Amino acid sequence: ATDTSNSVSKRIQNFNSLLKSIKHNESKIYKALKHDLNKHEFESFLSEILLVKKEIKLFVRKLRSWSKKKRVSGSILNFPSRNYLIPEPYGNVLIITPWNYPFQLSLTPLIGAIAAGNAVIIKPSELAPATSRVLKELVDSVFPQNMATVIEGDASIAKYLLDRKWDYIFFTGSTRIGKIIAEKAAKNLTPITLELGGESPCIVDSGVDIDKVAKRIVSGKFVNCGQT
């Protein structure tokens, strides 16, 4: 028998369900972000919900073609063999997410990981508890537990999860925590993606409209409580 529980068609179906669930629960998401970050609805829409919706629609549109086996050129040393690029999942993926964009930075990596056929656990930040609860409700209502789930908790839960063996770890957050995760991952040679915080420098030269540049820098620096 063929297992269709995690087929490309099933993943696309789940993404469409996720999109519908987000639309249905939009007011609840806004309230959670307001509670955790005091975000205005318009900012929450632009910086969180809109980006997630666009990511889902992109994968729904492109996943079938991205998942296909592709013929690629190879070395003359392998003649007369044929060479193919075959997309395969890593396996079990851990996603640890920050408090500053708690909705968007949880779901966008989830979408990519699920699209590739992985099983995913999200550990959201305990500093955004209302959004964390909404995330758990959304994910649990859409995905089978063996495909994706959310585990809430403080740093001790993150430590417990990091002590387990994973096939891939995705982390967004501080450089300090990133170093800890890199060290943990290295013990099992686990591949990782670390999106770490920085100072967001901006270079301004003499040929610019200084008033316009100043407004743009201030806007970029102070959006989302300066967490961009």
Question: Model-derived features: where do they sit?
Answer:
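A structured beta-alpha segment of the ubiquitous adenosine-cofactor-binding alpha/beta core
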Residues: 82-84, 150-167
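Short gly/ser/thr-rich secondary-structure transition/capping motifs
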Residues: 72-80, 150-153, 216-217
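Short beta->alpha connector loops at strand-helix junctions that form conserved
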Residues: 118, 123-125, 152, 172-173, ...
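N-terminal Rossmann-like NAD(P)+-binding subdomain of aldehyde/semialdehyde dehydrogenases
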Residues: 1-84
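Conserved small-residue-rich beta-alpha loop and adjacent elements
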Residues: 75-143, 189, 211
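Residue-level signal for inorganic ion chemistry
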Residues: 11, 56, 117, 148, ...
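ALDH superfamily catalytic-core signature
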Residues: 176-228
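A glycine-rich helix N-cap at a beta->alpha junction
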Residues: 144-150
